[in-house]
UniProtKB/Swiss-Prot annotation:
Pfam families: Rubrerythrin, RUBY_RBDX. Binds 3 Fe(3+) ions per subunit. Keywords: Cytoplasm, Electron transport, Iron, Metal-binding, Transport. Its cofactor is Fe(3+). Fe(3+) 2 binds at E53, E98, E132, H135. This is Rubrerythrin. The lineage of its organism: Bacteria, Bacillati, Bacillota, Clostridia, Eubacteriales.
């Protein structure tokens, strides 16, 4: 790959690295809020997504490290300030950020990388935008579940799994506490085997 030094692509990679690092940290904050509010599954999803963001940051940083080791890349960018409020607000805020990355930021950064002759970087931006699409969709579904009171209650009978002990409960609603380990309803999530 040719040198990134002095290119707009290098700036975009560093902006993306910084943005992904900040998203990761915000998601860990949001995870704590969700857990405190009794949404253990949503807390875990925020942590999982935070780890995904770390890997995105790593991918962007590796392009820079491989070519610009020991140098500084100056950027001028704005990043949102959103301290955790409540889980519903945090999910909507997170979805908004993911949507901006998948629909505006990363497609435009991919186009610049293509124009500057960095097809591998362009491909990375496009593939990571696809991952951000999954994050966006997941956050929106979780927000809708909270809004509709369907985190622990469904319209039909489903299997619920206690995230603490693995107990499986069948019903339209998760039990208020696990009959096996006595952990609260917060630990239940819809159970579906995907293997």
């Amino acid at each position: 790959m040719k040198s990134l030094k002095g290119t707009k692509t290098a700036e975009n990679l560093m902006k993306s690295f910084a943005g992904e690092c900040q998203a990761r940290t915000r998601y860990t904050y949001f995870s704590s809020t969700a857990r405190k509010e009794g949404y253990v599954q949503i807390s875990n999803i925020f942590l999982e997504t935070a780890e995904n963001e770390k890997e995105h940051a790593k991918r962007f940083y590796k392009f820079l490290k491989d070519d610009l080791q020991g140098e500084a890349v100056e950027i001028n960018a704005a990043y949102p300030v959103e301290l955790p409020t409540d889980t519903l607000t945090n999910l909507k805020f997170a979805a908004e950020g993911e949507h901006d990355e998948l629909s505006n930021l990363y497609p435009s950064f991919a186009d610049v990388a293509d124009e500057e002759g960095f097809p591998e970087v362009a491909a990375a931006f496009r593939m990571i935008a696809k991952a951000e699409t999954a994050h966006y969709n997941r956050f929106m579904k979780l927000a809708k579940n909270i809004e509709e009171g369907k985190v622990f209650k469904k319209d039909e009978v489903v299997l619920w799994k206690c995230g603490n002990c693995g107990f499986i409960w069948e019903g339209a609603e998760a039990p208020l506490k696990c009959p096996a380990c006595l952990h609260p309803q917060a630990y239940f999530e819809v159970f579906k085997e995907t293997y």
